[in-house]
Amino acid sequence: MLKNQKHAILYALSAVFLWSTVATAFKLALMQLTPLQLVFYASAFSWLFLAIFLLVNGDYQYVKTAFLSKPLLYLKLGVLNPFLYYLILFKAYDLLPAQQAQALNYTWAIALSLLAVPMLGQRLRKTDIAALMFAYLGVLIISTKGQFTELNFESPLGVGLALLSTLLWALYWIFSTKNTDKPVISLFICFSIGLPFIALVLSWQNAWQIPTVKAWLAAAYVGLFEMGITFVLWLMAMKKAENTASVSNLIFISPFLSLIFIFTFLGEAIHPATIIGLGFIICGLAIQKLIKSK
């Protein structure tokens, strides 16, 4: 693929814009569906998009070979994403204000550096510890709305689930380091494995229902713009980029843009502690990113 920085930035900005809308979309969708139902229907839409994408670009023929080469790895990945990760994440969004849940979700990169120590044998440097302290201080500020000395959490379970989702996502990426298959092929296989697990749990809980039109639209939006199209746009941005660092830095726009959508469409009053805490989280991520780029 020919490199083109302008095209890369356009792809990246499109992805960032769409990712910035999903926190709002999650909350709107959860007004229509339970977290488990949303995981299933959104994953189904994402699976359909990925299947069509692979058929169009000719990569569908490699799916079977990729799966058979490492079935146990794909089983682990598929259980993690979409099944466990999104189920836990959507439950966190169900319990927390969108502004809190989306901010806490951005700490997954810090969770990744923590898990990489025991699982990949990496060392935790002083800069990693500094990044960790900044990020989790931000988590504390957001979770307690600035009253962190009192440790008065609005929803301890919601905060716990949001942080657990970051560990699950970090775990997914650590397992993915062993995978050399094309990203879209890998993601399609994961969704092909994850969907039956979600369906089994839905059946076990007798939670099937025919969605309303609003619920279908909400699930389609989440499936396409959180799990499907946006992922492909970001991959295109990385492939087109002449300077990947400058393109990948655009992701830092997303959490703040997301707050605008949350305020506009959900009517949530953005608490000052959310902005301050998010600033600490972004500082932590920036420290981590700057050190890795050296």
Describe the function of each predicted region.
Residues T21-L28, Q32, S46-F67, L137-N152, ...:
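Membrane-interface helix-cap regions at the ends of transmembrane helices
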